[in-house]
């Protein structure tokens, strides 16, 4: 009988258990409406990864509620999953699901399957097209939408959108490139390819402030291996405004200073005395290595510009300037000595030395020190008058002094006519230049004048444009490859052309024929390296023409034309040195006839 009742008893127990579970679930759902709502919102997520993450957050919500009930620990309210945001309560920190990381109990899945990828593309592309259609032609909003889409959806942009965007970017880049190239493109091309041209951008600024600047030119041999013999020479440019002073300093290099514009009081300090000179445009003076000097611009209106040829004595092509003064741009070289050395040298406490020479007392802050901003400072008129009392003017009568300044225009020009004047001082005439094996030249040319083709026998000439503009043409030989067929290859000439303006520098190697055409009133200054016994050979003109000195028998063999034709051609030019740059009209009989000078001269045309 018990066996007959056992199944009925078991069935009753199962029924009671199911009813209890049903009531328990209903009660739990009633007590946890947020969890239920969270689960319902998860059903709307089609992406499997986001669906799993949503369920994980709902489970965390349940755990947080249970822990809160057990320990009575307040927890932040979970963010609703629907798009609308609830109003932010005071003191409640806003959380962003995309920005704030949440604990995810599942590892981030690997790249999606192809089916999911295709399904996602079908969903997202129409959305982007719809946004683009709503924005119309507003480019800024269009770019913002595209960037937002790319951040939200890590899928490739549709092919047609990629092509359109790439095409727009290419067009913009092409327009920008064309506008940049159109601006002085031809001039930049010549400057970059011409190894003998040094534009203003080839200078490096050493010191600069509102009163002036000091710049040094790039090393010559860094520009071209053809200028290897100039590796020991550097060019400095100094500019200063009126009523200014370059603080005392010395360098480990011999200086040859030339005044290009303005007036300067240049003082050289010796062990027992000092020499001060009032220098004008065209004056030059050698400053031996290690000599302390300073420069004043005493003029009230005109700026001072000078060029310095520096010949280092310690390292080839490298030199240093040592300033006595301590400034924000340069420490005094005295500060390099130890404290006890300074105290013993001046028999004074270091604190006093520091205060007097370096403008800093021990314990002073950086902002409290009284330092000059740079090595070029302003000077009062009273101080200028005091410094000018002992200044001597350069002599225009003598150029043979061993230590006094000389003027490049002190003698008559070596070449002169109505179109230009050429002044020059050679090492044979000046001991200062003889020690350095240098000649100095200064040239004035009228607009439209042409300095006839010529070459220097051994001097390398550094030409500095001071005022005006010019076109210059230099002729060299193309480099030939060292091969067995070299004997069969003809030697070809190469023309280096440049448009020069103020502050440009051009180097003329020895033996390279050169011609200068002034496109405006022109003034330039030249330094000749290896100047002793240099000879300037002209290739045209009635005087000093090297071609006219060649015997007729050799001319017959050297040129296609006869010796009589060569002589006649050379005599056509009655002027010398400076001529009109506009060629004269030829007679009808000479038209079409090949000229006899077809070698080097042909490279100038």
Curated annotation (Swiss-Prot):
Protein name in UniProt: Beta-conglycinin alpha subunit 1
Keyword Transcription regulation: no
Gene name, Swiss-Prot/TrEMBL: CG-3
Cell location: Vacuole, Aleurone grain; Endoplasmic reticulum; Protein storage vacuole
The family this protein is said to belong to: Belongs to the 7S seed storage protein family.
Lineage of producing organism: Eukaryota, Viridiplantae, Streptophyta, Embryophyta, Tracheophyta
GO cellular component, one term: endoplasmic reticulum
InterPro entries the record matches: Cupin_1, RmlC-like_jellyroll, RmlC_Cupin_sf, Seed_Storage-Functional
Subunit details: The alpha-, alpha'-, and beta-subunits associate in various combinations to form trimeric proteins.
Domain Cupin type-1: 196-354, 406-567
Positions with biased composition (Acidic residues): 137-149, 169-184
Propeptide: 23-62
Role, per record: Seed storage protein. Accumulates during seed development and is hydrolyzed after germination to provide a carbon and nitrogen source for the developing seedling.
Start and end residues of each stretch annotated as Disordered: 65-195
Keyword Signal: yes
